[in-house]
């Protein structure tokens, strides 16, 4: 890596040491995956995690894009014969793309402007003379340039003005100052357009009808909301800077002390025109684009963090679950699943209008029969259409059962997408889309990660303004989040679907399908080493993937840990030193392992960080990180918004976290909002400092708007 590139990356990643950045890039260049590096190359990187490694990768791409653009610009100017050593040095020293573009602007091929025409008419010497003029007789000088193309003095002066205005607008120094000044002191103004109020019938953008805020204080969600309002032709948006301060700067920068008064006024007017026609609009476009890019990055980050917490929700293990896909006219689809997610029974009941009364009366008995026949312990109700009516029906029904039966409201976003997919058709070819959806809802409760990876992450609605975000950047981030979650948890090699396996480090959909096919043809895997026999799974893929694949009850006990086979030798040494033969995972074995002085086992190949990981894995073979996370909130009774009163204490599940707060499901039809100012008594900017998707939280009702069906909540206990 070039020294300048490393310096640039260090500036963007100040919390990391140069050695860490270089080591991470070297490992990535060798074809190692981020999960593999984070887990198994801690000594090399100084224990960088997946998020830090992804940040290094992203910054490296930015640096490469900058260097590529610098070379393209240098080549283009060189081909024009206008590249000087000083200009080359300026371009190569630039650390931002907009600086490179500013330097390139005077040499950039552009459409034939008025200034270009004036140059072709031979008026550039006149513009240069006026800029430096110590004489007041501009008309006299302009008369010298009258020709067939320039019929009079006024035409000559207008041409000189065009040349000066364009030249001023292309000054990299002026553009840099104006950009920084506007960024620091400019304001974003939004107003309602004529007729916009009629278009905004529900008042979604009402708070932006007469809105202004400093650019430096614009929140990402406001930027995206204003952009959406502008796109809908409801809002008019502009960026304003103090024109007098801008003009004073331009005058100071451009007008020579020795200039004659008439020449000075001419240059001032040209500068004012340059700002009005060229500089102002260009910088406004640039800053609007920058604001949008930053807002998009933040929104994508929010989406990614919410998705991660959704994927990492604790699974419900060892329970028979009934998936309940609510509907009105077409009936509610039910799917009974055994503790491993295997389908036992599907049914359709009609508990809601417009179904005939006899069908509605039969629905309760049908549900009770399924619960008793299959000893259902939990019911997963999708949160879509007819969800709250179905919740009420389920709550009333389970009261008639003597043993405990609970229900959970499950986010069904994307369930219909998966149910209509080829994968779902292949698994359940005889079932309708709706019945497959009930299966998906039930499995989401049993193992959220295994089920949610089957659909596109974009279909899971846990973001803000996600449909306005750049699709490619969103996909890259969300794919990385899914990969991080799947590899942190690990998967059972003998039960995992190909969709889950495809997210394991080093694997893809093709290799994952090959693994499943090999498993179906040859029986269950009894050793990780058998992976080497899977078609097209080469040494590199094996190295990257094997540590994240678990085998329960296999030939090698270490295969049910996240210890990499490359470390089996040292793992066995540790077991031997602790005097452990076969009782791996027992409390006694864990105690003996934790008492070891592992520093004596440090070598060139195995460092302290890896040894600590190995000890943790040996103490808890087969561990699932998600088991320590809060379980879903189980309910037996139902609430309505009419039941809520200010001051009432409730328990709820965080469904979504956005920049301005968190949406909490407290058991009514619509999620309540905890504004960021009500998350904690302390001042915080980012709600994710306090809450995450899936958290179980205590809240108090602040206000209830029955007309708009909105509930304001607080996590700060009243009168505390």
Description of each model-found segment:
Residues 180-187, 324-328, 384-386, 410-417, ...:
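A glycine-rich phosphate-binding loop feature that marks nucleotide/adenosyl-phosphate handling sites
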